[in-house]
């Protein structure tokens, strides 16, 4: 579930429903959100057999769009339903099996129904053994060409000139807000535990600020994170929508619910829709930031009223998200390269010192600052058979010796590291009073010889998002 206000706080907002809501949230984490069996009604959907190009499934709201019932369309050939069907069929055959991104086939005209002869945008992708076609109101292509594309081109130039990731984020939220008109646009990244921190924000004055706030990992279940990696953009135009079921409910070719992972119109969990309403958010859009194949963060857009996002705008925003992802990946790779170069410099210096003195201990003791900088540590210990040399800020010698014994009992493990000594070394409770994390490397296969680096505890104040006025059940 995309971030907003902390979901746990929402549960606490109503004591009468807290138990049922807790169960709802637990169920939400298990919900197969890729197969909702329905779509959002800002468009309608048809599923075609890949080979025969006949209709296998259709959304019930086709009656609202075309004044035709689903059973009037099932089994019909593409060419029966759409003008220039042969041309469209050729375009559909060119869809890649590997690229599941919805592709704008063109603006099409239906041969019958209430929209007969009117242009309707058709977006399609190949997945789950079928062709999934989505139809929506056409966008103004001229406006997109004259406005959106120059904006994107200029934005890409600005990204390339950014000095760091924070500047990239600030530029991106401003640009996405300018392109989409959403009331609030923010970017947050995920830490190692999956919690999110808002780095940048651009908002209208009547929207509350989330800048600097953190959100718990539980707000986005694992299956939702996987979908954010697979499908880079997600739009909910109106949280009060009534979902339109598919007819028939299951894909006739597989006998299973249709996988809508990549569909723009894919319906949303009812729990999440209530979650949005409790945040006074009616429309939302999420753009994935994927770095090295992992979900690094999200560009999250909110609006207090229903808001349409046309295909051209979605395409521009997805491109912005992909460019931002590449730029962040490049910044991270550059920082990693610089760090490795610095490490190699430290290693050369330490090896030279050890060679000059013909001793590991004496060589490292001769370069205490370099030895500590190698691991960005505040203290270190050099352990040999007869010596325990301490550098910088370290635990007392007796606790270091106890740590060495504990390490020695871990047979066959040459490397140990932790960022939480109290959690990971409960056998030595006194140790956590002096250090928060450590790195230990065995340098002998026969003896208890170690290089150990220590880091102090780093206290961090986390500002979690406040709770809304209404509970999920309200």
Label the model's feature ranges.
Residues 151, 309-329, 467-469:
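Amphipathic alpha-helical "output/dimerization" segments
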Residues 303-309:
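A generic structural motif
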